[in-house]
């Protein structure tokens, strides 16, 4: 007579079965032309149930032949009293090829996917990377982790006395659901060009770092986005955390003269000035609220367009004084400053744009020339896109679409209008002024023969420990091309170039990027 036969029968069934996971494959990330930016490489881990291994010496020799590790290492592992021990982790398939087809009592082969990034540094801060459990830690990998991850399944297998399992068709199974694939708006070719040119600029200017963005002003699509120093996502532990940040969205800076387009737009839109109005620029020196504001040249009488073209601080401040606080603040907000752009990417900051009630007597002057205001490179690119496309502020986009494993579109980002900043006619006027900047003003080195380029430079002293540094700068350039039918907005930022003189060189370097892009377009 068997007592509690049902209990023993259930225990016997449990001992003869094992539920094993069926791993979902993480979705991949692609550029806008479907070039893969990620890969999933299968890695194998070897383990053993020591009590199930009949001949430990023979077992150790067999494993050693595949891994080239001494058999004694495995014999020591197999001497453990634990029910299960790992022998090797993260082996490539070629290492375990001789083992996979064999039924070896006590051996457990665990298969997992590991993320790989074939283009290493290119686009690394956009793409991000995953942890050992394949969860996204930064970048697109983190922001869209829920789409990429998929859902693991499981299968119940029959296990014999040697611990070897096999599938039985009558046993239950839950298939895995693979992750979705993401297609970005990023063009890998443009991304490579941008990063190469940023690296060249950092070297030439002996700068601390650099940022750059290429954006389609008609759609809000980000074509390229980079920060230097960068990192290799295949070896994230080899670089500082600071290098892993996409600082075009996470870091803010005072833009200096690239912000003057806000004053110009507001002045034209409110009819505060006309193209023929003249302002005396005080021979390059003007005192406001006890602070002396200077120009890079001793300008006298300049028209409104000349003030922007020659980047006169004194002239810009006089326009702002005629304009007033509220219109300047309104158009600054309308251009998207002081608030996040809404891009789907982790860590975006909103910048700094204080309400007018918090302004001092000096603030109107300072804000008009790009001080007392902090922006991100992405905000600057979005603002210049609004000028380029005829007055509409668009939400910037990094993701084109997300597709299920069978190719069905499950998420798509279309161009999204945030607001109209100004009329097409007003933005056409601002564009004409920015073309003059490149042709004859402070941006002459940015010109490309045969193409109309519109752009503006800016330089601001860095604010460190409560004071403005005398010798540390942020230099930046924002512009678009072709000016008569804008296709690309280009923003380049240099962090602490060797001297302020590198601002003019920056324009030339920024449009080397544009020149390369134009050549690519012409050759297609």
Please name every model-derived segment.
Residues 128, 384-388, 523:
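Short, amphipathic alpha-helical segments that act as regulatory/interfacial helices
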Residues 38, 160-171, 212-257, 262-496:
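Beta-lactam-recognizing serine transpeptidase/beta-lactamase-like catalytic domain environment
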Residues 505-524:
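Positively charged, low-complexity/disordered segments
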Residues 191, 313, 325, 509-510:
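Alpha-helix N-cap/helix-start and coil->helix boundary motif
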Residues 1-236, 252, 326-338, 347, ...:
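Periplasmic/cell-envelope proteins involved in peptidoglycan metabolism and beta-lactam response
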